[in-house]
Amino acid sequence: MLALLAALQLQAAGTAQLPALLEDSLPVVTLADALRRATGLDPNYVAAIGQVDNAAWARRSAFTVFLVPAVSVETDATKNLPAFFNFGTLKPETYSVQAQVTLRYDLFTGGQKVAELSRSAAALDGAHAGELQARFAAALLTEQNYYAVLAGEELVRVARERVQRAAQQLAVGRARVVSGAAVQTDSLQLRLELSQAREELLRQEFALRVSRLTLGSRVGAGGPVEAAPLDSVLPTGLPLTLDAAVEEAALRGPDYRRARATERAAAASYRWRLGSYLPHATLTGTGIAFDNRFYPTSRKFTQLTLAVSFPVWDNFQRENALSQARVNRDVARATRETLERSVRRDVTAAYDGFTTARTVADISAGDVAVARENFRVQQSRYRAGATTILDLLEAQLRLVDAEAALVQARYATRLTLAGLEAILGRRLFPEQEVR
């Protein structure tokens, strides 16, 4: 019996050591490094950064139209065959050169410049909120992949321990059958448990390989990566109350900030369209020079033009554009109101999700201790012939379930915390990001 038990233990240990040796060769990434690398590679975040840059240039343009006129420079050279009258030399010339400088300033645009200034400010605010939203969305996905690797490693450990326990129990069961202390079905039940434990180990190892590849792809690696272990101590509580979290999310949460900015931008666009119903006044200064060579200096003329235009009829194009702007404004308002009505629900779901997961993790830790002691007692009783194989197997399965539930509860706590941080747009525990 001792020889059989030793052989099964060596076989199980050898099976467990082979994947461990392969894992040692994988590159290791910390959570802070994974967040930094994944955020820079996320297409949505790159697009959000680009939107901030675009909105900043639009804001500069909206400011400068109040201060600086638009300037354009134009020149052309013409060869005439036969010679043609040249306004610069006042005689027929084969070549004529013209240069022109134009300065244009909009004196009155029906409020469109002011509306564009408001729209650009709202668009810039919305772009910053979108950048923050994209950053935390990428971080949430990265943390999900990171925790999946860590949880997968612990679940593989649980599955390996189950295989080792099943192998040990099979050796004990066979010895009891040989000695006549147990019936043949005991060893059959234990062999079935060993097969099922090995199947579960294969499934968990497969899931872990996929999780490592997913994390590697997320952080820009060419293959699988290993996640550096985290502090096993979970946060005991959140540093703010539920009401404070709701208020903060409504004021500074990226989703809600972006919705308000979108509404302001849509309202400004609607006002800009209204400006097309008012007259526009433009002051234009033009300097023109003529000659038969570059740079023309023979004749110079200067023009100063004040133009006033009043659009009367354009086949309902203004009305169509105004209707579209009004619809966009109404949709943006409805979207903002919907988000504001749901802010308490969203924050409460994330807040209570964290507290629930944290409590479940504490309960699961106690369940593991109870299940481990129960298995130890049932194992001793079975070896003494005081209980049945079914009671032993049930105790072993309960231990496996309790250990797996603890792993899932611990990382569910971290993931729900990341979800709440994404809603608020800030880290609640900044020191934990740098590990």
For each predicted feature, which ranges?
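Metallo-beta-lactamase
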Residues: 204, 254, 409
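Sec/SRP-type N-terminal targeting helices
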Residues: 46-50, 54, 63-64, 93, ...
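Bacterial Sec-pathway N-terminal export signals of envelope proteins
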Residues: 8-70, 74, 223-262, 311-312, ...
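A short glycine-centered flexible hinge/capping loop motif at secondary-structure junctions
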Residues: 177-181, 382-386, 423
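Long amphipathic alpha-helical coiled-coil segments
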Residues: 214-222, 272, 419-429
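Periplasmic alpha-helical coiled-coil/stalk elements that build and connect Gram-negative outer-membrane
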Residues: 29, 134-248, 350-353, 357, ...
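Bacterial N-terminal signal peptides
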Residues: 1-9
